[in-house]
UniProtKB/Swiss-Prot annotation:
Name of the molecule in the record: Putative multidrug resistance protein MdtD
Organism of provenance: Escherichia coli (strain SE11)
Periplasmic-facing ranges: 1-11, 70-76, 125-137, 186-196, 246-262, 307-341, 417-430
Mode of membrane association: Multi-pass membrane protein
A GO CC term attached to the entry: plasma membrane
Name of the gene this protein is made from: mdtD
Amino acid sequence: MTDLPDSTRWQLWIVAFGFFMQSLDTTIVNTALPSMAQSLGESPLHMHMVIVSYVLTVAVMLPASGWLADKVGVRNIFFTAIVLFTLGSLFCALSGTLNELLLARALQGVGGAMMVPVGRLTVMKIVPREQYMAAMTFVTLPGQVGPLLGPALGGLLVEYASWHWIFLINIPVGIIGAIATLMLMPNYTMQTRRFDLSGFLLLAVGMAVLTLALDGSKGTGLSPLTIDGLVAVGVVALVLYLLHARNNNRALFSLKLFRTRTFSLGLAGSFAGRIGSGMLPFMTPVFLQIGLGFSPFHAGLMMIPMVLGSMGMKRIVVQVVNRFGYRRVLVATTLGLSLVTLLFMTTALLGWYYVLPFVLFLQGMVNSTRFSSMNTLTLKDLPDNLASSGNSLLSMIMQLSMSIGVTIAGLLLGLFGSQHVSIDSGTTQTVFMYTWLSMALIIALPAFIFARVPNDTHQNVAISRRKRSAQ
């Protein structure tokens, strides 16, 4: 990329900057949840909603981000994304109640939903096609560093300052990014088709109310009748979307996608698989602090081996899948992740703390292999004219399943524990033990889906898409 103009390189730095902000925020909050609960006078069992409100908002807003960028311009939308993310961070730091914090996190989520996909779109428009892969590697590298720094930085700020600083550090960074975006980034626009607003609203309502209903009376205090009403509204909204999308060429996500068997299996497996794995980044630091008495900084440091294992495994995933095939790899990694989850719980409760970094490193390796395999399986056989829509739907499902996973983890803690789990409680470790056992079972269940995947070992990761028209 050395032959790119200076202006283009600066624009790539701005996109990389946004990727770093968004990825850092996905992990920096987890370590601070117990301290937030104490400061806000809430039970730790309710704090999972701090994560859910952000991730669910990202899932809801993702389908609109690309259309908005084409319609209004990538610079305008990227600038708006940074401003909303920064304002959300400020309001998070100023929050005095859990409800205020949840609203501020939702505002952050609107910005986060637009930042990454619009950043990818910007790279496509400013660099030559032959340099696109190198440019994407450059801008996504900070996004890989964010999860590595997030847990430890969050723990450090909580332990030596306060939880408010995990949000306040975004403000000067966001101001610099917003100014640089206005000054340096071109405002590319494209002719767009009419946005499927009806489909967008139906999906948004369905996802939001079903997730809220899943949280149930344990997390929200809603009555059983209200929860039943939410479930009914959510199901009706999703059914109406299916009717809306049938034979509709302008639907947000075409139902023709599901005629490709590997896409259907991969999407179902990704949804179920990420529900289980989405629990782990939330539960691990909470368990280390509340269940075992680790300090926030120590708990954050313990998360680093998991990220390192994930980053290291990415280099050889292609060779592994090509050697053994999708079915064997996905079934093995799904069951393996369940076993590693049990191993982590066992070694932690036995007090073998020196073993935990190695277990978490192994967990990161297994999870990374499974994620990469699920992603490529889902998209590899889609025809060209459906590839973009399929990728957008996969991105939305990834975020939605993570929010559901965190919600279920909070629900399990509430089911097995009292309203106020604390380090001093004699039943705390028992509560966490039952929760981890339930999580291990949930993590293993998608193996039944992956067992149905054709085990073609010759065309696994080479996504040289054949030119086909959608049927």
